């Protein structure tokens, strides 16, 4: 992500939460608009039970006499990711708030972004950064265990999207094949070569 683009869409599947958050935070401070899709597929290193215990301990942090004052703990994977990024930004300054407004994180791949080119961040990919055999868990599973209710809906919508995109890809391949065969069959190129073009 060295060159500046209007909006960068990152597919979060298979990325480590903290490593991706640090890269995104750096880009946001540079003025780049970033959209992170499939936040439920983010990974956290360490086995699931340990991460769940850590999250439950985090949920116990609240105002003693009036819990509605805060601290507020989000259960949705997209909000967990946003909070991780916020911790890496100077969010109490105008510059940090402006950077945070350029971030959009969502579960699944909703319609505006399913037609856009998605990128990955090699510096944050689990397969490249985590030693083979190490335990890890997904943010989606952790979220659904601590109160996120929309895991089934997101997975159902994702299955539907994958079927549509597979059909689109097959149609695209068929079209490319037709164009290639038409180019091979045409004798126009030969005629043009005869006349020196």
Curated annotation (Swiss-Prot):
Its subcellular locations are:
Cytoplasm; Nucleus, Nucleolus
Q: Where is it chiefly localized?
A: cytoplasm
Which Gene3D superfamilies does the entry mention?
6.10.250.3250, Ribosomal protein L13 (3.90.1180.10)
GO terms (BP aspect): cytoplasmic translation; negative regulation of translation
Keyword GTP-binding listed: no
Provide this UniProt record's keywords sorted from A to Z: Cytoplasm, Nucleus, Phosphoprotein, Ribonucleoprotein, Ribosomal protein
Give any Gene Ontology cellular component.
Answer: cytosolic large ribosomal subunit
Q: Which GO terms describe its molecular function?
A: mRNA binding; structural constituent of ribosome
Coiled coil location: none
Q: What else is known?
A: There are 3 genes for uL13 in S.pombe.
Identification of the protein by name: Large ribosomal subunit protein uL13A
Give the species: Schizosaccharomyces pombe (strain 972 / ATCC 24843) (Fission yeast)
């Amino acid at each position: 992500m060295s060159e500046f683009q209007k909006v960068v869409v990152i597919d979060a599947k298979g990325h480590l939460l903290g490593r991706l958050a640090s890269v995104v935070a750096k880009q946001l401070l540079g003025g780049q608009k970033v959209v992170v899709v499939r936040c439920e597929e983010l990974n956290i290193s360490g086995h699931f039970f340990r991460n769940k215990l850590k999250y439950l301990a985090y949920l116990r942090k609240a105002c003693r006499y009036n819990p509605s004052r805060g601290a507020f703990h989000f259960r949705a994977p997209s909000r967990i990711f946003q909070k991780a990024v916020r911790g890496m930004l100077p969010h109490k300054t105008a510059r940090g708030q402006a950077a945070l407004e350029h971030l959009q994180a969502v579960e699944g791949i909703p319609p505006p972004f399913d037609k856009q080119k998605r990128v990955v961040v090699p510096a944050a990919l689990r397969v490249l950064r985590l030693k083979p055999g190490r335990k890890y868990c997904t943010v989606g599973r952790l979220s659904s265990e601590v109160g996120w209710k929309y895991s089934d809906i997101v997975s159902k919508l994702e299955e539907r999207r994958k079927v549509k995109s597979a059909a689109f890809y097959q149609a695209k391949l068929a079209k490319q094949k037709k164009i290639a065969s038409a180019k091979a069959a045409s004798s126009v190129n030969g005629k043009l070569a005869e006349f020196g073009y």
